[in-house]
Amino acid sequence: MDEFKLAAGGALPPRGESATSDSRGVATRNAILEAAVRLFAEQGVLAVSNRQIGAAAGKGNTSVVGYYFDSKADLVRALVRRFNARVNEAREDRIARLGAKPGLRDWATCLVHPYLELLEAGGPPTWYARFMAQVATDPGLRRIVVEEATSESMLRVLDGLAGCLPELPEPVLRERYRIASHVILQMCAERERALADGQQVHPAGWDEAATGLVDVLVGMWTAAVTPVDESSVTS
């Protein structure tokens, strides 16, 4: 920013002013992100305008969202990236604590628990599960989730799961990965919605819910594979 001002012949701000401005900018951006994820979760991504987000962020200038994010897709990407960074950090910690020969349940735990731990730490209420479930099923925004899902920790988990399931044909393994993703996203979104509405949920804690999801996914991954007669499948 200062380089641009000098090139244009402008004077540098007084000492300390730039740092203060940067700090305010970070705070404003964070306020926008927090307001956006709440409104997206409660009302739907496509139903919420930048003006509504700016107002919910407590900004008098309701066009402020456009200053920080060029489009709604950019805002959605920032939210997905922000949450995934926290999940990946927690996942890396779990991977680092694995034993010498982790099994299927160990890798499934590394997949599920970090996601739910972040939701537990954030509330109640929390909004990210409902937001992520919406984006993951939106035709125009789903690619953002797919692009931002790739991380070293996630690849290690998927490799670990595959290593525990050598008997599964590759197409079946990939299909069950997709099923696992939908189960995690949708079950967490439903649980988050119920908690936000003040309903009782079972199990009561996110950790217990994560353990239940691991049970389900391990059962799915180890389920029998029914052979498909390709000749009977019509295009």
List each language-model region with its residue ranges.
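Hydrophobic alpha-helical connector segments
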Residues: R91-Y128, Y177
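Helix-turn-helix
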Residues: L39-E42, L46-D74, A78
